[in-house]
Amino acid sequence: MAPRSSRGIAPAMLCGLSLFLGFPGLVWVQISVPPQSSPHTEPHPCHTCRGLVDSFNKGLERTIRDNFGGGNTAWEEEKLSKYKDSETRLVEVLEGVCSKSDFECHRLLELSEELVESWWFHKQQEAPDLFQWLCSDSLKLCCPSGTFGPSCLPCPGGAERPCGGYGHCEGEGTRGGSGHCDCQAGYGGEACGQCGLGYFEAERNASHLVCSACFGPCARCSGPEESHCLQCKKGWALHHLKCVDIDECGTERASCGADQFCVNTEGSYECRDCAKACLGCMGAGPGRCKKCSPGYQQVGSKCLDVDECETAVCPGENQQCENTEGSYRCICADGYKQMEGICVKDQIPESAGFFSEMTEDELVVLQQMFFGVIICALATLAAKGDLVFTAIFIGAVAAMTGYWLSERSDRVLEGFIKGR
């Protein structure tokens, strides 16, 4: 393969890179993508560049391992010295840098391939860290560790120890982000250098801070014990350095509905529904009612269900009363069913006969078929010379002939033939 010429950074390439990468002096242009039904967050270009460099370095290790591994050491050293910085090796590495489905990696590689070639053939010795040279210095997609934003400003707490080591600096290592510290649980402040709400300083020196949890209801404290509270969380009151639960149900802080009652809980309260028997209540059950609901009556200290069925409340004939909780309903007595608003006798249907669902005409046809079979049997016996059966046969034929010649027979036969 003929060696590729190192052409440097062509102006056309710079314009292409500016669309994706944002060189100094050029405007960062974000290519808009039509909104999709499920939003997809693309990785920051710095992360794509870091992934490309990591894959490139793995490719360097793979190509050395696959091509050399035992045999004549002198021969390998000679060949390795020629292969190590060759274009052949570079092509082998670049072919495996991006996975087939990683579109961002392929796009970045296409736009920066000449830069990678320039580093490979000319810059390796003076800039051995490809990530620093390509992603930070050349493409300006990334920032050094502990810095963020277009100008690579130090994160709160300093670049050496961003966020004091107790949080994450948003955008750290990239040309984006706000630099805001997202502190770990228990830590707070601009650079996570203070203990957060509900925590106290268990240990502190020039470079080290340990924040431990206060006793449960304490918002601020001087130590872990119950008596170390300096400020209480909502729902608690400070009393002699201890946080005591406030009974909101005994104050105007509780706000429950007319048909609810208040139950105090630690640091708060709950509103629960009154019993069905109550119109307003002071607690759970029918014995804590302020007033009884319709359908209930005061019996001693409780609101109990009124049995309306003790009086004649169902005037309908064949009706009977059924008491329900707080009310009643009228139902039909046994052996009756409701039909059009009244209770009627529930007639038990008789057992259906074998021919009960057949029409009259269908029965007539069935009769004709039956008599036809009888006549055939008689004809068979008459053919044997039996005079008695011969006489019966002649009479049956005469009777059937008269029927079939009748008007009714014509109508039945016509309906049977036509399927009516």
Curated annotation (Swiss-Prot):
Sugar attachment sites are N205
Location of the protein in the cell: Membrane
Which regions of this chain are Cytoplasmic-facing, per the record's topological domains? Answer: 384
Transmembrane segments annotated in the record for this chain: 363-383, 385-405
Q: Where is the EGF-like domain?
A: 153-193, 305-344
Range of residues in the leader sequence: 1-29
For the Extracellular compartment, the record's topological domain ranges are 30-362, 406-420
- Principal location listed in the UniProt entry: membrane
Q: Which SUPFAM superfamilies match?
A: Growth factor receptor domain
Topology of the protein relative to the lipid bilayer: Multi-pass membrane protein
Reaction catalysed?
A: Catalyzes the rearrangement of -S-S- bonds in proteins
Give me the FU repeat coordinates as residue ranges.
Answer: 208-255, 268-315
**Disulfide feature:** C46-C49, C155-C169, C163-C181, C183-C192, C278-C281, C309-C321, C314-C330, C332-C343
Annotated EC: 5.3.4.1
Q: Which GO terms describe its molecular function?
A: calcium ion binding; protein disulfide isomerase activity
This molecule's function is given as:
Protein disulfide isomerase. Promotes the localization of acetylcholine receptors (AChRs) to the plasma membrane.
Family, per the entry? Belongs to the CRELD family.
Q: What is this protein called?
A: Protein disulfide isomerase CRELD1
